Amino acid sequence: MNKKNIITILLALVAILSVSIILKGQGNETKSAEAKPKYATEQKKTQDDAVLTYDISSLQDSASLIILVIREYDQQGMVDEMKGQRLKMAKTLSIGFSPRQSVQSDSIVTVYVRPDSRNGLARDLVLKPVPDAPETFYLYEKVPIQVSALRPNTFIPLAFYGSFWWDSNYKTCRFCGEKELTEENIKESDYFKYSPHYYIIGAIFSDNTARVIPL
């Protein structure tokens, strides 16, 4: 075998080895991309609102106290109810969350409830990872609840704070539904059908004498 043929063979082997390395690297990149889930949400307007504010001035003559109520649910139903201390009645009630949007690695979020501009209440909410997701993610979002009529001595739901759910068909964490819930559609929403874990944040506007009527 002459020198020219040897050089040709060596160059061919180098070319084959280079192609093999490139293809292997591309295969690893594809595998890594497939393992990382995507997130689907149709809550653009809601996500931009840092604080939810409600006008409760119509109850000032019939209620004197605000009682914070947080109800925790899973797909089996309500698992816990937390009642906060009583606050003096106000014209407005604001609900905010910290961090503003749940961070993937955070397992706790704080909800703040503030009457008018006064100091209010803060409660920590324990989050749960998205079931069936390939990695551990804590992904939650808030949705305001539009109240058709404010009633004293009755639990009034004001905000839904729920977990994303895993869509195995599209390999994504999903949170899609209405930008605002109402008391009429609250139980028919996809959030309630598919969210594996959620909280309903609300209040009882009490006259301090009557029996509280459950939702």
Regions inferred by a protein language model and the residue ranges of each:
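Polar/charged alpha-helical tracts
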Residues: 3-4, 33-34, 107, 183-188
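Assembly/interface hotspot detector across virion components, adhesins/toxins, and nucleic-acid enzymes
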Residues: 3, 99-102, 164
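Structured domain cores in non-transmembrane regions
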Residues: 60-142
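Mature extracytoplasmic/lumenal regions of exported proteins
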Residues: 114-205
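Start-of-domain marker
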Residues: 27-84
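Short A/G/S/P-biased low-complexity tracts
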Residues: 207-209
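Bacterial Sec-dependent N-terminal signal peptides
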Residues: 1-32
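Short, solvent-exposed mixed-charge patches
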Residues: 213-215
